[in-house]
Regions:
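Helix-to-loop junction immediately C-terminal to a conserved catalytic motif
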Residues: 48
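Glycine/charge-rich catalytic "coupling/switch" loops of P-loop NTPases
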Residues: 258-303
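Conserved ABC ATPase "signature" region
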Residues: 102, 109-127, 178
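ABC ATPase NBD coupling module
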Residues: 65-80, 103, 222-226
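Conserved catalytic motifs of ABC-family nucleotide-binding domains
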Residues: 152
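Catalytic Walker B motif of ABC-type/P-loop ATPase nucleotide-binding domains
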Residues: 156-159
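Conserved ABC ATPase signature
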Residues: 131-135, 139
Length: 303
């Protein structure tokens, strides 16, 4: 449904996105994670037609949204956007949520019903006449989410939706994201500084580094089989050892400074690799009691 093909974006001669490519299917939750300044917010703004790419293409349902002006307006109406710092008007909650509906020419009677329904979805039923600017940060973010969802978008874009929120508000927003996707089938693309939030919520994760996706995969793939040393370090793997692939009794092993570690991954002999070792992958036993088992790695140690 959403295709990113070599998307580039520069500001004042500095390239922020240097060829971002990915495919997001209808009904998926796609998380964009990456270091600060990696271009996560820029990418979402390009998808939402708030900025224009320097190069490459963004296609939604096969339409290049930045090349086809006639289609861009129609496509934009298919999308809702929630920003990191939600902007609310100095009026009631109901008036804030109704803005997009009025732009679309919806009749007042229908607007009232849709606003009430949207507030119920985000857990703010009865808030219609509250002044929006008197709400807490978490409540404001839920109002922003209701405002985005009241237009019934096919695609929901969320830029750091839980940044600076307290843990209770974070949990409520995360529950809403899952429920909206599950119940309405909405395609959701969100950026986050919290990589574990991506792990909890997303079907696919894109790790944005150095202007490109260094890896796109399921949470399990990204966190247990990182595509590079850089990705491994970013997702929190600290024990990374360099080695060279060697043949070992008909199987593959990695020679890491004299210690051979067997691997199930299909590797090519003499290939230089990096081993990512997690504490949960290790078992410690006293040296005198250590036993060897076929296919298991046993490392020598002292009492």
């Amino acid at each position: 449904m959403i295709e990113l093909e070599g998307v580039r974006k520069s500001f004042d001669g500095k390239e922020v996105l240097a060829g971002v490519s990915a495919r997001i299917e209808r009904g998926e939750i796609f998380a964009v994670i990456g270091p600060s300044g990696s271009g996560k917010s820029t990418l979402l703004r390009l998808i939402d037609l708030l900025d224009t790419p320097t190069g490459g293409a963004i296609r939604i349902n096969g339409v290049d949204i930045h090349a086809n002006r006639e289609e861009s307006h129609r496509v934009q109406r298919m999308m809702g956007m929630v920003f990191q710092k939600p902007a609310v008007f100095n009026t009631t909650v109901a008036e804030n949520i109704a803005v997009g509906l009025r732009f679309r020419g919806i009749k007042e009677a229908a607007i009232k019903a849709k606003v009430e329904e949207a507030l119920a979805v985000v857990g703010l039923a009865g808030y219609e006449e509250r002044r929006a600017r008197t709400l807490s940060g978490g409540e404001m973010q839920r109002v922003a989410l209701a405002r985005a969802m009241v237009i019934e978008p096919e695609i929901l874009l969320m830029d750091e939706p839980t940044a600076n929120l307290d843990p209770v508000s974070v949990e409520k927003i995360e529950e809403l994201v899952v429920r909206i996707n599950r119940d309405l089938g909405t395609t959701i693309v969100f950026s986050t500084h919290d990589m574990y939030q991506g792990q909890r919520l997303a079907h696919l994760i894109g790790v944005l580094m150095n202007g490109r996706f260094a890896q796109v995969g399921t949470p399990r793939e990204v966190f247990t089989h990182p595509a590079s040393r850089e990705v491994a370090r970013f997702v929190g793997i600290e024990n990374i050892i360099d080695g060279v692939v060697v043949a070992s009794n008909g199987t593959c092993a990695v020679d890491a400074g004299g210690v051979r570690i067997r691997t199930r991954s299909p590797l090519t002999p003499e290939e230089l690799v990096s081993l990512c070792i997690r504490s949960e992958d290790l078992r410690v036993t006293p040296a005198g009691e250590a036993t060897t088992a076929p296919g298991k790695n046993t490392l020598p140690g002292d009492r």
